Design a protein with these regions (language model features):
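Catalytic cores of RNA-modifying enzymes
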Residues: 1-153
């Protein structure tokens, strides 16, 4: 399944009865080079633990999981949980945290899930939380690098 192919995405979402939510700032990557380039730019390798925020259906998540020692993705939209279970089933180094990243204690999350690895953040950020989230991430001082895609509005 190609998570950047419109037909594959439509079939996947239809199987799970999913419809986009503008209120959640959802936008899914449909050009294959975008998740590949973002994942390459973050410099993840087997010694890296990646925190991803808002994985959506998982195109960036899969690219990260092919490179990193561990990928932890935080997703708020419970409708996407079964979608991610399907798209990430082949990646034992993937963990999904179900909930709101703005309610997470980032240093504790990094210690618990990414301990022993070089912690980085890599994400295609939901536009409705970009500024407050980046503020929290920088203030947490628990990531060695940040690589984010931000929507131009």
């Amino acid at each position: 399944m190609d998570l950047c192919n419109r037909n594959d995405i439509q079939a996947l979402l239809q199987r799970h009865g999913f419809h986009f939510s503008k209120a959640m700032g959802q936008n899914f990557l449909i050009q294959g080079w975008v998740p590949r380039d973002i994942a390459a730019a973050c410099g993840a390798d087997e010694h890296t633990g990646v925190l991803e925020i808002g994985p959506g259906i998982g195109p960036l998540t899969r690219e990260l999981a092919q490179r990193a020692g561990k990928v932890v993705s935080v997703e708020l939209d419970r409708r996407l949980y079964p979608v991610l279970e399907e798209t990430m089933a082949d990646f034992p180094n993937f963990t999904l945290i179900r909930g709101d990243v703005m309610q997470q204690e980032l240093p504790a999350l990094v210690r618990e899930h990414l301990g022993g690895l070089r912690p980085i953040l890599c994400a295609n950020l939901p536009y409705n939380i970009t500024t407050p989230l980046l503020t929290r991430v920088v203030e947490s001082r628990c990531f060695q690098s940040l690589t984010v895609l931000i929507q131009k509005e």
